[in-house]
Amino acid sequence: MALWGGRFSQESSALFKLFNDSLPVDFRLIEQDIVGSIAWASAITQVGILTEQECKDLHHALNELLAETIDNPQLIIASGAEDIHSFVEQSLIAKVGDLGKKLHTGRSRNDQVATDLKLWCKKEGEQLLGLLANLRAALIELAERELDAVMPGYTHLQRAQPVVFGHWCLAYVEMFERDISRLQDALKRADTCPLGTGALAGTAYPMDRVKLAKSLGFASPTLNSLDTVSDRDHVIEICSDASISMMHLSRMAEDLIFFNSGEAGFIDLDDEVTSGSSLMPQKKNPDALELIRGKTGRVYGSLMGILTTMKALPLAYNKDMQEDKEGLFDVMDSWSICLEMAALVLSGLKVNREKTLSAAKQGYANSTELADYLVAKGMPFREAHHVVGEAVVSAIAKQTPLEDLTLEELQAFSAVIDADVYDCLTIESCLAKREALGGTSLPQVKSALAVKQAS
């Protein structure tokens, strides 16, 4: 039976019920709905709606229902209830009779679902923070394991300057630390309790909403009933945070897919995160990484979906807002599995150091060092840049690295070049000079790694 049937003289059509019911999606809120109902029973007891014994009976029945359903979603879905709130109330009435009909006194499904959703976001958000921390730890472990492996750094997907692999790992540590900070901030803003604000104008009962909020683990109650039941900022913000984090995951996946390609051959991926081809027996495909990259799109889609749903809604609750959950649940599921999979990929990754070093020595990645050498000799940088560009053109024509040009050939571009030029053109010199804070010199990377390991 629907919770709102008294106003209507005929049953809803089967098509409308199928269209309107949200239980196949919001059954996931069972724990939060029951926990919120337990708190509400205590709150209405304190204002005289229930006796202490009635409150105890409701608490017992609600806890019993939670034990029956927490690991049995099919039991919930098979009930045919309109939504998770209807399921809980109908199940409660079946257990305690008319006493169950008292529980909804002073409460609306509007503040109820807002409370459920915030409780769910808080719980799942904490789990996501743990997964982000695990991925951060996996990157730090990989950075330590492959710290000094020399590889080319890229701009425009062209070899630019040499870096060490540990520096690459720590770049992504920075990104995922920002993701952690963003999610922490979002959860802090979500830590206000909607319960007790009613349908839109507040409850008619003199609730201690501060006490109610604390009983549910919130920092404080919300302060405006109209805003409270209209608000889905926490859903949007978490989906936004997930989208940014998935972008970071996708970029990391793209790097690793390229590093693993036959054209690069910089890394080997473990068999447990790759698959083969049904036709080509030689193939070992980076499917885990490609799926991370692919799932990023569906997370973006969910963010755009909730933004579009909310963009023109008048205050307060509108049924459009029922569409907030499916996308949110999918975002959190996708984000979670991608974080877990990324950590697994990193745990078995091996760097082919000979190939990365060989690649770092190609592509004239030491050109900037030659320009800096000329600057040290007193030449203005812009002029040095031009001179080195001419030297690179000459080296390309001769199909030789810069460091293999003779001194006479180099001096043809500038008379200030001397025999000491070759010292600055080595890979070791290129790396060692990047010693300012944040650079890729080995001492700097070791120092940065130590900071991350200690925090």
Swiss-Prot record:
Q: Does the UniProt entry include the keyword Cytoplasm?
A: yes
Provide GO CC annotations from the record: cytosol
Reaction(s) catalyzed by this protein? 2-(N(omega)-L-arginino)succinate = fumarate + L-arginine
Any Pfam family hit: ASL_C2
An example molecular function term from Gene Ontology annotations: argininosuccinate lyase activity
Q: Which UniProt keywords apply?
A: Amino-acid biosynthesis, Arginine biosynthesis, Cytoplasm, Lyase
A Gene Ontology annotation in the biological process aspect, one of them, is: arginine biosynthetic process via ornithine
Enzyme Commission code(s) on record:
4.3.2.1
Answer yes or no on keyword Secreted.
Answer: no
**InterPro entries registered for this protein in UniProt:** Arg_succ_lyase_C, Argininosuccinate_lyase, Fumarase/histidase_N, Fumarate_lyase_CS, Fumarate_lyase_fam, Fumarate_lyase_N, L-Aspartase-like
PROSITE patterns this protein is in? FUMARATE_LYASES (PS00163)
Per the record, the major location class is cytoplasm
What is the uppermost EC class here?
A: lyase
Its localization reads:
Cytoplasm
Its pathway, per UniProt, is: Amino-acid biosynthesis; L-arginine biosynthesis; L-arginine from L-ornithine and carbamoyl phosphate: step 3/3
Xref: HAMAP family: Arg_succ_lyase (MF_00006)
Q: Return the similarity comment.
A: Belongs to the lyase 1 family. Argininosuccinate lyase subfamily.
Entry-linked NCBIfam families: argH, PRK12308.1
Protein name (database record):
Argininosuccinate lyase
Species name: Shewanella halifaxensis (strain HAW-EB4)
The UniProt gene name for this protein comes to argH
